[in-house]
Amino acid sequence: MGLTNEKLASLIKKELALIINVSIRNNKIGFINVTEVKLTNDLSFANVYYVILNNQPEFLSLAAEIIEKNKSTIRMLLAKKIRNIRKIPELVFIYDTSLEYGNHIDNILKGINK
């Protein structure tokens, strides 16, 4: 019996975090955190949401460039780590803006309370 969609997404998230921060690590941008992985029902695509600790615009674009440049290597390394599925999904990396949005809302609420 195969893994459920949620368990597989969780496993992919864990493995991608290790692969990105160990195998393709770039000291200029620092730590990249994989926040969420969403799989399509047919498991052909995985939307991988990530944030970086240094969220200045030049570092965001550098992180996106490094991830895109190494996407095939990341997928290959993921395939070596996860062997109990037939096909590794195509990875689509998306910068996660939800943390920034949450901070923005928090600042608005703090301004209202003053």
From Swiss-Prot:
Pfam families: RBFA. Its main location: cytoplasm. Keywords: Cytoplasm, Ribosome biogenesis. One of its GO terms (cellular component) is cytosol. GO terms for biological process: maturation of SSU-rRNA. One of its GO terms (molecular function) is ribosomal small subunit binding. The keyword 4Fe-4S does not apply. The keyword Calcium does not apply. It is found in: Cytoplasm. One of several proteins that assist in the late maturation steps of the functional core of the 30S ribosomal subunit. Associates with free 30S ribosomal subunits (but not with 30S subunits that are part of 70S ribosomes or polysomes). Required for efficient processing of 16S rRNA. May interact with the 5'-terminal helix region of 16S rRNA. Belongs to the RbfA family. Monomer. Binds 30S ribosomal subunits, but not 50S ribosomal subunits or 70S ribosomes. HAMAP family: RbfA. This is Ribosome-binding factor A. It comes from Phytoplasma mali (strain AT). The gene is rbfA.
